[in-house]
């Protein structure tokens, strides 16, 4: 079981640091096998917004971007990412920034055009093993804000080696209950607003293996837009738990499993036949 320490502390926040928390869990039989930071070491990276894009005069695959980073003047940054668009918000490594692997960003010229900074992908920041193009940030990200603060990257992923008798701790809720008992801290169960489902459609279900599955519950949900991106905060919670984003429907079910321990699966209603 791998999880974000910040996620756990949303449920229960004992007055101890990461090392003390890991010791408490291990002594309680929930052996901590690994603790690792959720992102690579980097500094001086902020939220930027691409204001304009022009073709590079001497390189077909490069483009010259004017980028706002919350200062009086925008920065000119040469970029080769295929997905850069006007208006998008992206991580910007300022001149003097240090990225994972020891790369230091300097003011330079690319094919004769000055470039003052670097637009970053998720992999260049240690947030993904690989990535295609720039990391797109949410539209509500504040231009100029430090990226580590915006993404709350001062966090650790904790991995537990659970024994078969502790299946109750295969989720944040179960681990939080255990930590609450160990530290005598109150567990704060998140308040979730009830969502009204208006669909009147249903699908008959037949349980053919009642001994193994005595009860099955499903619900038809219509009007789901699978073209939208999963919210970045949910993508980050999944990533810090060892899962990658696979689209909003799968991500929501995986998130519920990790937080509450309730297995779920989303089916395409149009492809279901029978019951």
Question: PLM features: residue spans?
Answer:
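Phosphate-backbone binding interfaces of nucleic-acid-interacting proteins
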Residues: 1-199
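Glycine/proline-enriched, intrinsically flexible loops and inter-domain linkers
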Residues: 5, 23, 28, 63, ...
